[in-house]
């Protein structure tokens, strides 16, 4: 069995620095309160129109590939971890492939919240150990700032999170160096204690969800008219 190792690493954060003092102007908090609880002094937030989840991932990936010493053509798979994709679907993995000018290789998206990169790295590691791929680009990118409650009510969360991206190139190794093993666990019993419940299907029909929004806005749900027609014809067959 092969081993996998990190051959290149890159990261990107937006230019917009948000300090604890900046937050204290809009939230009932202060630098001492934040540092005492988190150790955080500043975080980065995107400026609308300048950065996206995909664009930050692209910038981090370019650095990782350059540092790995391999060419773009040597990348044979992508694993992209995020919970803040640019679109509901397709995921950012395929956008990354396009923007980097890579071959039409596979791109897998992973949504595992804070542990997303760990899961992405583990998946890539297993792909390499089985001999399926040789060089895998693993990317994690998040735009959290646009979904934060920037009021005193949300300060326990909003002072923690920022925006940015990281990337590694995971490469096959014939020696014992690299990732030894990974062990993943979950505890669904407490899932709803840290959850974002919307948007979500929640067992509803697509037509029910759309009725709560503006049906003229096709962006409410991708391929609106195609799905509406398909689901309308299928729905009676389920009863």
Language-model segments: residues:
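Short beta-strand segments
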Residues: 10, 81, 111, 136-142, ...
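Flexible, glycine-rich active-site loops centered on histidine and acidic residues
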Residues: 129-165
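Phosphate/pyrophosphate-binding loops at sites that engage ATP/ADP/AMP, CoA/4′-phosphopantetheine
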Residues: 60-76
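Conserved catalytic cysteine-centered active-site region
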Residues: 35-55, 83-136, 141
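Condensing-enzyme catalytic core mediating Claisen C-C bond formation in acyl metabolism
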Residues: 1-48, 154-234
């Amino acid at each position: 069995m092969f081993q996998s190792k990190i051959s290149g690493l890159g990261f990107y954060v937006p230019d917009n620095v948000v300090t604890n003092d900046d937050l204290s102007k809009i939230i009932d908090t202060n630098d001492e309160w934040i540092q005492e609880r988190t150790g955080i002094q500043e975080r980065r937030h995107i400026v609308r129109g300048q950065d996206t989840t995909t664009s930050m991932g692209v910038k981090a990936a370019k650095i990782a590939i350059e540092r790995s010493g391999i060419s773009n053509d040597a990348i044979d798979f992508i694993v992209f971890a995020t919970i803040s994709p640019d679109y509901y679907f397709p995921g950012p993995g395929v956008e990354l492939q396009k923007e980097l000018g890579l071959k039409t290789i596979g791109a897998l998206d992973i949504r595992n919240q804070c542990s997303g990169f760990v899961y992405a790295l583990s998946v890539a590691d297993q792909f390499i150990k089985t001999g399926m791929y040789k060089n895998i680009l693993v990317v994690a990118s998040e735009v959290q700032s646009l979904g934060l409650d920037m009021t005193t009510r949300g300060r326990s969360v909003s002072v923690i999170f920022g925006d940015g991206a990281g990337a590694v190139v995971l490469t096959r190794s014939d020696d014992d160096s690299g990732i030894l093993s990974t062990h993943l666990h979950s505890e669904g019993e407490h899932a709803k204690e840290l959850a974002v419940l919307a948007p979500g299907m929640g067992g509803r029909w697509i037509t029910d969800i759309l009725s709560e929004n503006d049906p003229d806005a096709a962006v409410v749900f991708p391929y609106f008219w195609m799905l509406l027609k398909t689901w309308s014809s299928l729905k009676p067959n389920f009863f």
